[in-house]
Amino acid sequence: MTTQLEQAWELAKQRFAAVGIDVEEALRQLDRLPVSMHCWQGDDVSGFENSEGSLTGGIQATGNYPGKARNASELRADLEQAMRLIPGPKRLNLHAIYLESDTPVSRDQIKPEHFKNWVEWAKANQLGLDFNPSCFSHPLSADGFTLSHADDSIRQFWIDHCKASRRVSAYFGEQLGTPSVMNIWIPDGMKDITVDRLAPRQRLLAALDEVISEKLNPAHHIDAVESKLFGIGAESYTVGSNEFYMGYATSRQTALCLDAGHFHPTEVISDKISAAMLYVPQLLLHVSRPVRWDSDHVVLLDDETQAIASEIVRHDLFDRVHIGLDFFDASINRIAAWVIGTRNMKKALLRALLEPTAELRKLEAAGDYTARLALLEEQKSLPWQAVWEMYCQRHDTPAGSEWLESVRAYEKEILSRRG
């Protein structure tokens, strides 16, 4: 530890102690909050099923930065490089299309064995795994419908895919000793004016009930469902709306997924957390950055990211909220994208843990809104960066932008050689 860092750390401890904050306790709490990194940033949501296939489902990864991962080995190597530069506990979030098999596997036939390499890798790297059925980029999703499809056979295919995915998820949890959160998102919807909005939702309701009918150990597997406002090609009607999934998660007591980009541009999920927690047992968060639509830009340390973190910490939701990331930017170095976004999420959590929440609550309850605003703003100037740098030091990761040198070296030595 450098003398400069030691001095900054000691000063930070004193400054935060003056407002009633124990920085050591804050760092201990931060180590209780893993962030689930999404594998699909590494290859632009391509997966390993069909290298020539295109991304569908009303989502887009824009850009053509060189060096994207082309197979599981490259993707795991890239993830390891990113994770070395991110302090503290992490998880990995996988989609079903990232299976590994020597022969083609139909999505309704995926099995735990197709993900055993991921599990062994997770064990070696002390990671938990999360999972998602992939209800997009497939011939049977080409018309824009999956679990709500009017064709019984197509709908059953997707039901069977989700049921098979739940078994994979439970396998993750059993093998790794930490529950896998499996999130169901479907792209189902219509481009233009929709006459019958009820029937697809009735079919989706019945399909989801069949999907979750098999009882699985909650210590191994957690079901989550995710809404969306619209997607490309589904601008006028989305079957799985916020109201649909809020009702479903409440009535079935599944987890509810809130994606930062899946609502109207003037809505924020930070305001939805406390409301949803009154009705659902657990929340899954997909922290993202929507720019005018669900563009999935890299997460910044901005007001909304901070507000999300603050909601988790202020209400002590550590055991009820699962923090995941969801962005995919193909216009910049993909490893850097992971590092920037994940470090920013962790910085926001740390800043929330360094807030004198008890004092702010007292001021609010007393109606002293002047002091509340003053303290909230003064808090931003306290030396949280020194605490962050100590956290990085203790986890043997770069504290500042030094991590970028490692990414550039990896790009030169590894990524530049990929076709």
From Swiss-Prot:
Which cofactors? Mn(2+)
Q: At which positions is Mn(2+) bound? A: 262, 294, 296
Recorded hits in InterPro entries, A to Z, give: L-rhamnose_isomerase, Rhamnose_isomerase, Xyl_isomerase-like_sf
Q: What is its main location?
A: cytoplasm
Q: How is the cofactor bound?
A: Binds 1 Mn(2+) ion per subunit.
* Keyword list, A-Z: Cytoplasm, Isomerase, Manganese, Metal-binding, Rhamnose metabolism
One BP term from GO: rhamnose catabolic process
So what EC number does this one have? 5.3.1.14
Q: What class of enzyme is it?
A: isomerase
Q: Which Pfam families match?
A: RhaA
Gene Ontology, cellular component aspect? cytoplasm
**Gene Ontology MF: a single term:** manganese ion binding
Q: Which reaction does it catalyse?
A: L-rhamnopyranose = L-rhamnulose
Q: Where in the cell is it found?
A: Cytoplasm
Pathway field: Carbohydrate degradation; L-rhamnose degradation; glycerone phosphate from L-rhamnose: step 1/3
How this chain assembles, per its entry, is: Homotetramer.
Q: Which family does it belong to?
A: Belongs to the rhamnose isomerase family.
Q: What is the purpose of this protein?
A: Catalyzes the interconversion of L-rhamnose and L-rhamnulose.
The protein depicted here goes by the name L-rhamnose isomerase
